[in-house]
Amino acid sequence: MPRVKRGVTARARHKKIINLAKGYRGRRNNVYRIAKQAVMRAGQYAYRDRRNKKRVFRALWITRINAAVRQHDMTYSVFINGLKKASIELDRKVLADMAVFDKAAFAAIVKQVKAAVAA
C-alpha cells in the first residue's frame, strides 16, 4: 500500500482558512493557527447574529409603527388590537414601511382601525 502524504490536502485546507480570514488585522489574516480561531469565532458571531437580526428588525418595525400611531392619538397595543378586529392582515414590516414612506395610506388604515375599535 503506498504511503499517503498530506501536503496537497493540508495546503488546500490552510488556503481555505486564510482566504476566509482576508481583511482581518494583524496575524489573524496570514498565520494559519490564529486565522483558524478568528474564522471560527466569526462563524459563531454570524450564526448568532443571523437569528438576532430578526429580533432587531421586529423591534425596529414596532418602534416605527408606535411612533406613527401616536401621531394619530393611539397606542401601539390598541392599534394592533384594532387591526385584528378590523381583520386587516398586514404584517409589521409592511405597516412600518407604510408609516415611513406612505403616510396617507397609513392614515387610512388608522382610520379603519379607529372605527373597528369604537364598534
UniProtKB/Swiss-Prot annotation:
GO annotation, cellular component aspect: ribonucleoprotein complex; ribosome
Source taxon at top rank: Bacteria
Gene Ontology BP terms: ribosomal large subunit assembly; translation
Key words, A-Z: Ribonucleoprotein, Ribosomal protein, RNA-binding, rRNA-binding
GO molecular function, one term: structural constituent of ribosome
Ribonucleoprotein as UniProt keyword: yes
Pfam families for this protein: Ribosomal_L20 (PF00453)
Sequence intervals crossing the membrane: none
Keyword Ribosomal protein in record: yes
Biological function: Binds directly to 23S ribosomal RNA and is necessary for the in vitro assembly process of the 50S ribosomal subunit. It is not involved in the protein synthesizing functions of that subunit.
HAMAP family (alphabetical): Ribosomal_bL20
UniProt family annotation: Belongs to the bacterial ribosomal protein bL20 family.
Entries under NCBIfam families matching the protein: rplT_bact
Official protein name in the record: Large ribosomal subunit protein bL20
